[in-house]
Amino acid sequence: MRILLSNDDGIHAPGIQTLAKALREFAEVQVVAPDRNRSGASNSLTLESSLRTFTFENGDIAVQMGTPTDCVYLGVNALMRPRPDIVVSGINAGPNLGDDVIYSGTVAAAMEGRHLGFPALAVSLNGYQHYDTAAAVTCTILRALSREPLRTGRILNINVPDLPLDQIKGIRVTRCGNRHPADQVIPQKDPRGNTLYWIGPPGDKRDAGPGTDFAAVDEGYVSVTPLHVDLTAHQAHEVVSDWLERVGVDGQW
């Protein structure tokens, strides 16, 4: 199995280093990751400037100022030959649950892999300690995928409780919950008296009931949420069509 491995915490982050070491026990791994923390970069792609890469002695490649999406795009289209069998993103420091997937660079890297035609996993740890647990879970899932590929064009968003491996209760397939909208902005003054703003933490859980990714992780289970790239709200087609006909917008400009 050939794996393109990226993340959004940066190439030196403990999550990606732990996962790369574990994956190399049974797979060919090419790391292509940002040279610094790009958390919250979502699906941003660098278009107005060039991208420079640096290759370490072990073959890992850092993309200077690159986003997670940049890294996967370059990895698939230029840096990994032959191309990968699968794209893996993580292990993220902290969860990507519910609305987090909108902003997450970890999920975005996997989404770019899927967009380019490859199976993709995004892996996050609900904390900052037991990266070895998340790595073991990821390796188990990847070994299973190598034996029997998943017949669905979906991204698997995997969130792992921050627990020792022997305390993980199992795996649940979940849906995304959601949070209350975040509204905290923290102002500060720089030495010249200008105002700086920091975006505050995410909102509290709102929909975290049974079946959600929040609930699974809180109860000690690995959460696996299938995601897809198509953002079309297919069930809303008829509602929107009826509304447009009713209000008479068509042809009124």
From Swiss-Prot:
GO terms for cellular component: cytoplasm. GO terms for molecular function: 3'-nucleotidase activity; 5'-nucleotidase activity; exopolyphosphatase activity; metal ion binding; nucleotide binding. NCBIfam families: PRK00346.1-1, PRK00346.1-3, PRK00346.1-4, surE. InterPro entries: SurE (IPR030048), SurE-like_Pase/nucleotidase (IPR002828), SurE-like_sf (IPR036523). This is 5'/3'-nucleotidase SurE. The keyword Nucleotide-binding applies. A divalent metal cation binds at residues 8-9, 39, 92. Its EC number is 3.1.3.5, 3.1.3.6, 3.6.1.11. The keyword Metal-binding applies. Its cofactor is a divalent metal cation. Keywords: Cytoplasm, Hydrolase, Metal-binding, Nucleotide-binding. Binds 1 divalent metal cation per subunit. Belongs to the SurE nucleotidase family. It catalyses: a ribonucleoside 5'-phosphate + H2O = a ribonucleoside + phosphate; a ribonucleoside 3'-phosphate + H2O = a ribonucleoside + phosphate; [phosphate](n) + H2O = [phosphate](n-1) + phosphate + H(+). HAMAP family: SurE. It is found in: Cytoplasm. SUPFAM superfamilies: SurE-like (SSF64167). Its main location: cytoplasm. Nucleotidase with a broad substrate specificity as it can dephosphorylate various ribo- and deoxyribonucleoside 5'-monophosphates and ribonucleoside 3'-monophosphates with highest affinity to 3'-AMP. Also hydrolyzes polyphosphate (exopolyphosphatase activity) with the preference for short-chain-length substrates (P20-25). Might be involved in the regulation of dNTP and NTP pools, and in the turnover of 3'-mononucleotides produced by numerous intracellular RNases (T1, T2, and F) during the degradation of various RNAs.
